[in-house]
Amino acid sequence: GEGINGTIAGVYESIIKFESHLLSLGFADHNPKYSYSKIMPFFRLKVRDKKEIVTLRSKNVDPENITGKKIKPKYWNNLISDKKTILIDLRNNFEVEMGTFKNSLNPNTKSFTDFKSYLKNNLKKAKDKKIAMFCTGGIRCEKMSSYMRKKGFKDVNQLDGGILNYLEKTSQDNSLWNGECFVFDNRVSVKNELKDGTYDLCHACGYPVSQDMLKSKKYQKGISCINCYGKISESKKQSLKDRRKQISIAK
């Protein structure tokens, strides 16, 4: 298997105890990242057994033995400021639209698997170029850098610990990050220095909603946003309205 990827939230003492328990089980390459939230990021426990931590659908990867060079946040700015560096955002299009590094390429993908086609169609002549890639927490980079190395790319670099590690370790004054970073919990997004972001989440389609989008007539809290308005069936819309009522009563 590829290992375990997980996120938990709780008070400091509980997190430390849990981490100690994990280490006692003998897991290798323990690489935790910490941040703080004013709200509980998760409402329930969710455990999934998957064939791949992030789905690439390729046997041509071996992240345990071959990946790109991991670049610490303190060295990242120098790398991506080099005009010879090709900087690639590995995340999906909606994530890139929320925020990214200046001058990065947006592959316009809807899923991680799509990046293979982008690579074939757009970067096949860049195998001797200096490549720098980044993603939210570093996992997508682990797989894609391995895939690219196997495909003959010689100088592949990846942001160690991903965007979240960079935002945590880099002061806002020195940051080359623009915008916000989508996170897969109730915070929805974070900004420089991992401060809480401004995005909300459409509970009908799971799409992040900016403050400007909240002003749209197509936005109804918990029912629709500009991404899914007109695409939701009446039965689904009614069930969402019923859910909103239940949440309101529970509060």
Regions found by a protein language model. Name each.
Residues 85:
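Hydrophobic "anchor" residues on beta-strands that sit immediately upstream
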